[in-house]
C-alpha cells in the first residue's frame, strides 16, 4: 500500500524501494527530530540514539491534526460528512487525527554486511493514537467495541497497534533477494495510505475509503530478482482481520507484481482474493488494482502523474437479492513541486458502487455513482530548517457528487474545505 506517490524525492525513493536497492520499509521513511533528541541522552561514552542506530533500529513518528467544514451545511441527524468514512470530522471540531510512533529495523539489500552474511532480520512495531484509529481497527485488536470498523467514535480518541511484524531476508546472489514478512501489516493495495505523510491530501479517495482493506495479518513473501521487477505473494486472514477472524478460518491471497523500467515509470498490479463475508468461506471477494506512476522528464522532474484503478467483486454483495455485486474506482492524481515551500496537487475520481455494497448510502441493492474533485497545496514554511522542514500544512477544497440525493442535506453534491497540519519526528 502506498509505494507510488508524492513529490519527486518520495516518488524516487519509492522507485528505489521497488528496484530492490532498499527494502520498502527502509529508513528512508524516518525523520531526524526524535533520533536527534535521543542522541543527546548520554550513557557513559555513548548515547541512547547511537546505541539504537548501532543495532540497526530507528525510532520515528508524526503528529497530525486537522479540521473539515462542510460548506453545504451540517448533515441532518449526523455529525459526520457523507463519503468521509475515514477521517470524517466528528462534530466539525479541530481534531487530533493521528499520533504515530514507530520502532523499525529495516533490511537494506545493498548493505555490504547483509550481502556478505547472506541474510538479515528486521521488523516494525507501529502504534497509532487519535481520532482515525476507530476507522482502522482490525478484528481481534478492536479494544473499544465488539467488531472492527463500526466507527462508534466512543471514546473519540483511541489507540491502535497498526503494524506488528517481523521480517527475515536472504541474499540469493545473482538471483536477487527474498524477504518474508510475518505479522500484521498495512495492505499492498491502494495508492493512498493510513499514514498521512505519504498522501497528497488530508481527505481520502473513495477507493481508499470503501474499495480496499486497510490492514491484513499473515505471511507475505517479497522477491526482488533485479532492479526492475518486484513480486509479492502471501496469505492472510482477510480484510482487516487479526487475532480474530470473521469467517471459519478462511485465508486470503495477497499479491503484487511491480515493474520499474526507469526512474520515470512505475507499473504495479495488486490482487486480493479470498472469503471476506461474515460467517462463510464461500463465495470469494476479489479486487484487482492496476497502479501507474509517471514522472515526466519535463519541468525538472517536479511533476508526478498517477492512475489508480480499483476493480472489485463480491459473490454475495447484493444485500437485496443475496447475489453478487461489483465496484469500480478510477482516481487520477497530478502533483507539481513549485518550489521548496509549495506543492500543488489535484485529484479526480469516479466510483461505481454496484448494488450499494461498499459505500451503502443508497437503498440496499441500488447502485450508486459517485465522484470527487479535490484541489490542495502542501505548504512547508521552514524548508531550510533541519527541524522546521518536518512541519507542513495542507489546505484543500473538495467537491463530491452523487447520482442519488444521498449527500449533505439530501443533495446530489457537497462542498467541503479542510486543512491539516503535520509534524514528523
Locate each region found by the language model.
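Surface-exposed extracellular loop regions of Gram-negative outer-membrane beta-barrel proteins
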Residues: 103-132, 222-233, 291-298, 302-313
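Surface-exposed coil loops of outer-membrane beta-barrel proteins
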Residues: 71-91, 134-258, 268-275, 365
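Outer-envelope exported proteins of Gram-negative bacteria
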Residues: 56-64, 120-128, 179-183, 234, ...
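Glycine- and aromatic-enriched membrane insertion/assembly motifs of diderm outer-membrane
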Residues: 86-131, 332-344, 351-353
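N-terminal periplasmic/intermembrane-space "pro-region" immediately following the signal or transit peptide
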Residues: 1-78, 84, 111, 116, ...
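Outer-membrane beta-barrel pore domains
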Residues: 27-29, 34, 85-88, 133-136, ...
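Short loop/turn motifs that connect adjacent beta-strands in outer-membrane beta-barrel proteins
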Residues: 41-59, 72, 107-121, 171-178, ...
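Residues on the lipid-exposed face of transmembrane beta-strands in outer-membrane beta-barrel proteins
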Residues: 61, 96-105, 163-168, 182, ...
Amino acid at each position: 500500500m502506498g509505494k507510488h506517490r508524492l513529490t519527486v524525492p518520495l516518488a524516487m525513493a519509492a522507485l528505489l524501494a521497488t528496484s530492490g536497492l532498499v527494502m520498502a520499509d527502509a529508513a528512508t521513511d524516518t525523520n531526524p527530530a526524535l533520533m536527534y533528541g535521543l542522541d543527546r541522552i548520554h550513557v557513559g561514552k555513548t548515547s541512547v540514539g547511537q546505541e539504537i542506530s548501532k543495532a540497526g533500529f530507528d525510532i520515528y513518528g508524526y503528529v497530525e491534526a486537522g479540521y473539515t467544514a462542510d460548506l453545504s451545511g451540517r448533515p441532518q441527524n449526523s455529525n459526520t460528512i457523507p463519503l468521509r468514512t475515514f477521517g470524517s470530522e466528528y462534530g466539525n471540531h479541530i481534531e487530533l487525527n493521528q499520533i504515530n510512533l514507530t520502532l523499525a529495523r529495516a533490511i537494506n539489500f545493498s548493505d555490504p554486511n547483509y550481502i556478505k552474511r547472506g541474510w538479515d532480520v528486521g521488523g516494525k512495531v507501529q502504534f497509532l493514537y487519535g481520532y482515525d484509529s476507530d476507522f482502522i481497527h482490525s478484528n481481534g485488536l478492536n479494544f473499544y467495541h465488539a467488531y472492527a470498523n463500526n466507527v462508534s467514535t466512543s471514546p473519540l480518541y483511541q489507540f491502535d497497534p497498526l503494524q506488528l511484524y517481523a521480517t527475515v531476508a536472504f541474499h540469493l546472489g545473482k538471483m536477487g533477494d527474498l524477504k518474508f514478512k510475518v505479522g500484521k501489516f498495512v495492505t499492498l493495495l491502494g495508492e493512498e495510505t493510513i499514514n498521512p505523510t505519504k498522501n497528497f491530501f488530508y481527505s481520502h479517495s473513495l477507493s481508499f475509503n470503501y474499495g480496499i482493506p486497510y490492514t491484513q495479518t499473515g505471511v507475505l513473501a517479497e522477491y526482488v530478482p533485479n532492479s526492475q521487477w518486484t513480486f509479492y505473494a502471501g496469505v492472510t486472514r482477510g480484510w482487516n482481520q487479526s487475532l480474530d477472524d470473521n469467517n471459519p478460518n478462511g485465508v486470503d491471497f495477497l499479491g503484487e507484481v511491480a515493474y520499474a523500467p526507469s526512474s520515470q515509470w512505475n507499473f504495479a498490479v495488486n490482487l486480493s482474493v479470498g472469503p471476506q463475508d461474515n460467517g462463510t468461506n464461500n463465495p470469494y471477494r476479489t479486487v484487482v488494482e492496476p497502479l501507474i506512476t509517471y514522472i515526466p522528464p519535463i519541468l525538472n522532474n517536479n511533476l508526478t502523474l498517477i492512475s489508480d484503478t480499483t476493480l472489485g467483486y463480491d459473490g454475495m454483495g447484493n444485500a437485496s437479492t443475496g447475489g453478487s455485486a461489483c465496484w469500480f474506482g478510477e482516481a487520477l492524481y497530478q502533483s507539481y513541486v513549485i518550489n521548496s515551500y509549495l506543492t500543488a496537487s489535484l485529484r479526480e475520481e469516479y466510483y461505481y458502487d454496484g448494488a450499494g455494497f461498499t459505500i451503502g448510502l443508497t437503498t440496499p441493492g441500488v447502485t450508486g455513482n459517485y465522484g470527487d474533485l479535490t484541489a490542495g497545496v502542501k505548504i512547508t514554511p521552514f524548508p531550510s530548517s533541519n527541524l522546521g522542514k518536518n512541519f507542513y500544512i495542507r489546505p484543500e477544497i473538495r467537491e463530491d457528487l452523487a447520482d442519488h440525493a444521498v449527500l449533505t442535506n439530501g443533495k446530489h453534491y457537497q462542498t467541503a474545505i479542510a486543512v491539516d497540519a503535520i509534524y514528523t519526528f
